Amino acid sequence: MKIIQTENYQSMSKLASQHVINTIKQLNKPVLGLATGSTPEGLYQHLIKAYRMHQISFANVSTFNLDEYVGLHKEDKNSYHYYMQKFLFNHVDIPYKNIHLPNGIAKDLSVECTSYEDRIQQAGGIHIQVLGIGRNGHIGFNEPGTSFESQTHVVDLDESTRNANARFFDSIDEVPNQAITMGIQSIMRAKEILLLVSGSEKAEALEKLVNGNVSEEFPASILQTHQNVKIIADKAALQDISYHHFSETM
């Protein structure tokens, strides 16, 4: 596990984008695992900028998102389909057929979960998975207590997670109670994991990830066992972690 400290959110986002850009350039058919929320927005802005400057193309890129709310149509402004179009896909040359997100309005959610796993495997697996971390240690929508053996599944959202996401909705009552999420085993199959952490409000969770015990009660702790994890975090998020943990390079 490498930890790279940056000065602030902006430098975290830029460094993350440089790493993703290098990955895209190195591979013939790169497969990216993508996340939503406020943390990766800066990363996506830098990727769009690189595309507009003709530094990269997404023509051969395939993407798989971590999760989607159950019950929200892809055109709903709070769906993750909508988020990804708004913050990345509408601004680059990625073919529509290469974009994959769970279908939160599928008639049979169990079949959708199995199908999503199959699509990831058919694409050859994920080369680099972008992650954030929740204050309770969730990754994707895998809440505390989720089995480390879990694959893509439907999850009941923890109240703390719904409260954290309420800022994106008109009220807490509009936040869905369920989501489809890649499971922890699904995430761990990625060849590389890129965890982005920013802000003092994530410091306690990040310290627990780095120094705590591996436990299903803190899902992100499983990342300690992955062979290729890079954490890019700003100073505020790293305030509880001693400097000797840090790496100078990617």
Curated annotation (Swiss-Prot):
Please verify whether the record's keywords include Hydrolase: yes
Signal peptide location in the record? none
InterPro entries, sorted: Glc/Gal-6P_isomerase, Glucosamine6P_isomerase, Glucosamine6P_isomerase_CS, NagB/RpiA_transferase-like
Q: Which UniProt keywords apply?
A: Carbohydrate metabolism, Hydrolase
Q: Name one GO molecular function term.
A: glucosamine-6-phosphate deaminase activity
Q: What is its EC number?
A: 3.5.99.6
Pathway assigned in UniProt: Amino-sugar metabolism; N-acetylneuraminate degradation; D-fructose 6-phosphate from N-acetylneuraminate: step 5/5
* Similarity annotation: Belongs to the glucosamine/galactosamine-6-phosphate isomerase family. NagB subfamily.
What the protein does comes down to: Catalyzes the reversible isomerization-deamination of glucosamine 6-phosphate (GlcN6P) to form fructose 6-phosphate (Fru6P) and ammonium ion.
The entry's protein name is Glucosamine-6-phosphate deaminase
UniProt source species: Oceanobacillus iheyensis (strain DSM 14371 / CIP 107618 / JCM 11309 / KCTC 3954 / HTE831)
Encoding gene per record: nagB
